[in-house]
Amino acid sequence: MLALGAAALVVSGLLAACSASDEGGGAARLRGEITFGVLAPLSGDMAERGQDLVDGAQLAAAELNDQGGVLGRQVKLAVEDGGCAPATGEQGATRLAAKSVAGVVGGLCENAAVAAANAVAAEGTPFLVSSARADRLIEAGLPSVFPMEGTVYQEALAAVHWMGYRSAQRVVVLADGSPASQRLSGLVTDRVKADGLTVSRQSAEANRPDLAGLVSTVTAAKADFVYWTGAAEPGGRLVSALRQAGYTGYFMASSESDSPEFLQAAGAAAEDAFLTTAAGPRLLPAAADWAARFKDRFRRDPGRDAMQAYDALRAMAQAVRQAADTAPSKVVDNLPRLEGFTTFTGTLRFAADHSLRYDNYVIAQVRGGTFTLASKLRTD
């Protein structure tokens, strides 16, 4: 078990003296406190991303306090290390629930987030899971848990939509041997077939994909659109091999390739390649001012986890305001019907199964050796 003294950090969004004005000042003095929990991996391989998540929540808390707090009370954060394993996720969530927090945001590693969600839901505490993949959380059917990431099916829909937009006629879907890649490739293939297009599907070994075999599949199919659902580095080598073989059609990769490894492996062949990926601050012009505020405070650029946690904490605060109460059941009731609340990607709405009604997938494109925004896909 994690040492409680090291793992349990209580972080104030702002010191009370800083969040309240002197008598006669312009801002109302905050009276009392409201504490939200933040769960993130703060040790191990994912610690850097975990700290990014925490920093995003801290910025949201500070800005909420600058704006008068929540229900006139100062926002504070209770931060727990949830690690990346089910046991540590459950332990961190249990400690947060014991603090009677008004709600929990965070969750990054899928296995830890699912375990944490079960622990939090047992207490009825609202939990906005900001970074972990949504599918297993939705399948669990936990009434107080709301994922803020899209599902694999939603990524498949984004991919097929972009194929249609680019007037694809002959599609080849290529996967590696991993379960996630296989699932996404299957969903995309089924949707492409349903749209009446010609589609071929082939899988390769996850660790040592036969690039020559994959290139042969594309050539034999006379494909004009290739979609890769596997890991980043092999995906980069694949697009390079395709271009060397004379393939001139579209190449798109899944969110697994949203990585410098893809760009490095592909080299110049990455240029103009597309990507289905969850939106992050570097792709969203609407996040530029926020990113500048983040950098001014933390002396570094924010990542996706910071942006997601920032939006999650603001959404939780909005639910508390609408409920005019911190009672868990009332906050949970308000999360699916936030009034006029927007994130950096648009309106935040949850479907009946707690999936995002409007998911956060976008289309990125490699331009000048870097990922740029090609389309938000959304019209709201």
Tell me what each language-model feature is.
Residues L14-A17:
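C-terminal motif of bacterial Sec signal peptides marking the signal peptidase cleavage site
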Residues S21-D22, R49-L53, G68-L142, A206, ...:
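Beta-alpha junction/loop-to-helix N-cap segments that form part of ligand/metal-binding clefts
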Residues E23-V38, G69-Q74, A97, G164-Q169:
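Immediate post-signal peptide segment of exported/extracytoplasmic ligand-binding proteins
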Residues G25-Q58, Q67, E80-A87, D176-S181, ...:
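Extracytoplasmic "Venus flytrap"
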Residues Q91, D135-R136, P143-G246, P281-D289:
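Extracellular/periplasmic Venus flytrap/periplasmic-binding protein
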Residues L96-L108, L128-S130, R170-A175, K222-A232, ...:
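Periplasmic-binding protein-like
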Residues V239-Y310, F371, L377-D380:
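Extracellular/periplasmic periplasmic-binding protein-like sensory domains
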Residues F298-A306, A317-T370:
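Segments of small-molecule ligand-sensing domains
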